[in-house]
């Protein structure tokens, strides 16, 4: 998908979502806290079931990850990445399969061709990367949380992946469950590209220090029961203004259980361009 195609997708998606909000508002779920229940409870249950399913039956996957995150107040252009991710697996409380990550940056032009590999428990916990173009002269080993690896990033590479996204969603929702002031709505019939989804929208109309966002939307693929898009906004800067986009992640062309091997996370793989 080209940058222009992505822009058209976002615009058409925004229009269709607005229509969806109008049409389904009366049928959506929007509840306030009562007794020991909370409006987030159904969303937490959906996320937990999704995580359990992934941990049980998804070994690995490939996708085109499109992301944009605000860093130091600046919102950059979308980054497009071809990713291979092997999920972490345990057996009898012991690590059986370490998480593995391979990323090849596709866009924008200034990062096109950059490759990054990280494997849990290997290379002293460091990622191994190389730059693109004429700067591709050496491999570098970097602390995932260090300055160089975090430059232009909101989260470390070790936080990537659908299971980590689900863990973040569950953790955030569990914390917010301690407070009033949350509205939750569910919309069927949403789409991400050609994938049919159910969208869960969480809104905090009144800004409070214990809330990290104004509105967040999670799109669960109806076939896979996995979140393939997450987007959040902070509160409008002026009364009656538009919410401020904070971060968005979309997993396009997702393929599950593609039998990735250790070779897929080896910088010496001849299919890669490591020097």
Where are these regions (language model features)?
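Bacterial N-terminal signal peptides
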Residues: 16-28
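Glycine-rich, flexible loop segments associated with nucleotide phosphate handling
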Residues: 40, 87, 95-103, 213-216, ...
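Boundary at the C-terminal end of the N-terminal hydrophobic targeting segment
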Residues: 30-37
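N-terminal mature ectodomain segment of secretory-pathway/periplasmic proteins
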Residues: 42-136
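Bacterial N-terminal signal peptides that target proteins for export
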Residues: 2-18
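Short hydrophobic transmembrane-like helices used for membrane targeting/insertion
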Residues: 7-10, 22-23, 31
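Short, surface-exposed loop and linker segments with low hydrophobicity and enrichment for Pro/Ser/Thr
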Residues: 14-18, 51-58, 90-97, 190-196, ...
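Gly/Pro-enriched, hydrophobic low-complexity segments
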Residues: 70-72, 109, 117, 123-275
């Amino acid at each position: 998908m080209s940058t222009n195609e992505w822009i058209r997708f976002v615009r058409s998606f925004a229009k269709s979502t607005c229509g969806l909000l109008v049409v389904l508002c009366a049928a959506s779920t929007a509840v306030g806290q009562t007794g020991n229940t909370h409006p987030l409870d159904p969303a937490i249950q959906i996320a937990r079931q999704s995580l359990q399913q992934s941990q049980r039956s998804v070994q690995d996957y490939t996708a085109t990850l499109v992301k944009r995150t605000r860093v130091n107040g600046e919102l950059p252009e979308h980054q497009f990445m071809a990713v291979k991710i092997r999920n972490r697996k345990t057996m009898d409380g012991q690590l059986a399969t370490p998480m593995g990550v391979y990323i090849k940056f596709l866009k924008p032009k200034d990062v096109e061709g950059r490759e990054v590999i990280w494997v849990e428990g290997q290379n002293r916990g460091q990622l191994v990367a190389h730059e693109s173009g004429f700067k591709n002269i050496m491999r570098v080993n970097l602390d995932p949380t260090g300055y160089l690896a975090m430059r232009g990033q909101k989260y470390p590479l070790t936080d990537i992946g659908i299971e980590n996204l689900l863990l973040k969603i569950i953790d955030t929702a569990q914390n917010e469950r301690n407070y009033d002031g949350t509205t939750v709505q569910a919309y069927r019939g949403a789409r991400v590209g050609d994938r049919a989804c159910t969208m869960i929208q969480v809104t905090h109309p009144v800004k409070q220090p214990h809330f990290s966002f104004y509105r967040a939307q999670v799109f669960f693929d109806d076939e896979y029961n996995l979140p393939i898009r997450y987007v959040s906004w902070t509160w409008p800067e002026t009364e009656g203004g538009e919410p401020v986009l904070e971060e968005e992640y979309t997993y396009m062309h997702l393929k599950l259980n593609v039998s990735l091997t250790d070779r897929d996370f080896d910088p010496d793989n001849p299919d890669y361009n490591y020097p």
